[in-house]
Amino acid sequence: MSDYNTGGPPPGPPPPAGGGGGAAGAGGGPPPGPPGAGDRGGGGPGGGGPGGGGASGGPSQPPGGGGPGIRKDAFADAVQRARQIAAKIGGDAATTVNNNTPDFGFGGQKRQLEDGDQPDSKKLASQGDSIGSQLGPIHPPPRTSMTEEYRVPDGMVGLIIGRGGEQINKIQQDSGCKVQISPDSGGLPERSVSLTGAPESVQKAKMMLDDIVSRGRGGPPGQFHDNANGGQNGTVQEIMIPAGKAGLVIGKGGETIKQLQERAGVKMILIQDGSQNTNVDKPLRIIGDPYKVQQACEMVMDILRERDQGGFGDRNEYGSRVGGGIDVPVPRHSVGVVIGRSGEMIKKIQNDAGVRIQFKQDDGTGPEKIAHIMGPPDRCEHAARIINDLLQSLRSGPPGPPGAPGMPPGGRGRGRGQGNWGPPGGEMTFSIPTHKCGLVIGRGGENVKAINQQTGAFVEISRQLPPNGDPNFKLFVIRGSPQQIDHAKQLIEEKIEGPLCPVGPGPGGPGPAGPMGPFNPGPFNQGPPGAPPHAGGPPPHQYPPQGWGNTYPQWQPPAPHDPNKAAAAATDPNAAWAAYYSHYYQQPPGPVPGPAPAPAAPPAQGEPPQPPPTGQSDYTKAWEEYYKKIGQQPQQPGAPPQQDYTKAWEEYYKKQAQVATGGGPGAPPGSQPDYSAAWAEYYRQQAAYYGQTPGPGGPQPPPTQQGQQQASGNCHPPPPPFSFQPPATVHPALVGSAGNPFPCGVCP
């Protein structure tokens, strides 16, 4: 062990495992350093001389040098003072000193500072950060947070949120403000947005929201709330809405206030405070141009006055009032007629009534579509009346095709196959192969819905089986006007890539039990061709449809019933459709003035067409053809054989022609014959035939086939008059014992 100076104390004890520093030299240095942590013994600083090294001590410090121990002790003192100050300020929040560590709990950090070859400045900076992190929670920096309610247009909420919330997330990230949008507007045109954050963050978020709304409206960025406050050219006016009537102005789902804003071109805000009593009047703020604001105020007051009068919101004979308008239900198959070709009809209704009409969008499955009429109440009712008149004219419908054999011709076409009432114009039933039904219906019914919307017709699958019961086919029904049915038929044929097979009669044909149409002349026209409906009576007058129904073809009297054509129409549905459309689309325009002569029978197959009659009509050929057809029909069992009166009728007409021209025997030239007796006999026979008191005669004859007159005293049809005049006098050679021409041997 080395010698010490005379003035120095004896050396300290050797440090364990590599010794500590020696004692301070003469001159009185500070206490020796702590024990060495490694195999090296740190020499303590000496004022008068170097300290003694340990057994394996490290190198001694130079004389008078200040080693790291001085700086570390000073730093530890500063930390201790800081902790004392923190304890005085924070009380129990101050951090306690761990007595298990040598120097104020920083023994664990000694190796971090001592080990390594980093400069001392980095070591101190790292230690300062550690101290600051421990002292940081004691004094958090002051931060001001606020929450503000902001309003944006309800229609712009989707634009503010963005796809997948992208836009609202960008607003929150860029502004540092939390943005929350209320889930519902409560019927108001604006949606509440909650902004939470620092004042500058909230202000930035508001600016970003204004920019998005302004861009969505097509205006310059940042102009939304400036315009909402009226701007330089705008006017803001508030009117008080009485308690309990705020919902009337707002409407269901905000529909009424939206319509008012659209019609007046203003912005309306109903100020509602949740803390207010429901019995308190609420202000309605109207923003816009002065003239428009005044007009909007009048519209709102009109709504409130109608409510006071009890007329608003009630349902009338035309539909339901909603938001100052009227909803009129229109059958789906009649929508195309109300709209008209290229919208001509609905434009005409709008111009005449001074309203606006729109059909509401729906799923296309219901039987009706809603036409919403917007405008003043009296004009809305006028437009609704026009639409209902048009629908009423549709219910009478165009004439249908001929019915079954022996049935009267079709009347006005609303009769279905079962005789019940249906849509105007009737319906069409057709069969489609089962494996192609999916092409018509589509996934979820989307194809049939599209067909209904495009054509205005109503297409549905029938639950009835095909007539032959074939399970490989399904029946479909199309209801609507002829134009709508044709359009829907064309679209369906494109889907299945083939023609449709109609089943049953065409639209408007009366069923087996269907009543006769209002224009059917009655049983008198069931006789042979050439006879007038009522002998000597004028034809039915032709009145064009009045009002809004004049867009449809005018009704013409039906042609004489032809049994062969009726049988062909019953067996071939296509023939019935062809006759129906030819009658519907090719009618001669305008009524025919004056009594028209009875139509002649169509020429038989293979015969040339007859020239138009001039002067006195000759029905000889028509009667011959009629009796030939009657003779071809099968006789009923037990009925007496029919006789051929063709020659007798020819002779009869020849003599009648002579009488009419004044060449008959006993007729003075130029004198008008007297038909009184002939008319009396004719009406007596008609009364006896139709169940009234029969004239004197023998027993009733047995029933004969349809089309043959069968009554006592009138077993054969009376001779048809010329130009609606009865025969003058029957020739004695042609008169039977009872005054009837051509006695059959059954009648007396």
From Swiss-Prot:
GO annotations of cellular component type: cytoplasmic stress granule; cytosol; nucleoplasm
Keywords in alphabetical order: Acetylation, Cytoplasm, DNA-binding, Isopeptide bond, Methylation, mRNA processing, mRNA splicing, mRNA transport, Nucleus, Phosphoprotein, Repeat, RNA-binding, Transcription, Transcription regulation, Transport, Ubl conjugation
Pfam families documented for this protein: FUBP_C, KH_1
PROSITE patterns assigned: AA_TRNA_LIGASE_I (PS00178), KH_TYPE_1 (PS50084)
4 X 12 AA imperfect repeats: annotated span: 572-685
Annotated positions of the Phosphothreonine modification: 101
Compositionally biased intervals (Gly residues): 18-28, 36-69, 409-422
Compartments reported by the entry: Nucleus; Cytoplasm
Gene3D superfamilies: K Homology domain, type 1
SUPFAM superfamilies: Eukaryotic type KH-domain (KH-domain type I)
N6-acetyllysine PTM sites in chain numbering: 88
Stated family: Belongs to the KHSRP family.
Record's protein name: Far upstream element-binding protein 2
Organism from which the protein derives: Mus musculus (Mouse)
Lineage: Eukaryota, Metazoa, Chordata, Craniata, Vertebrata
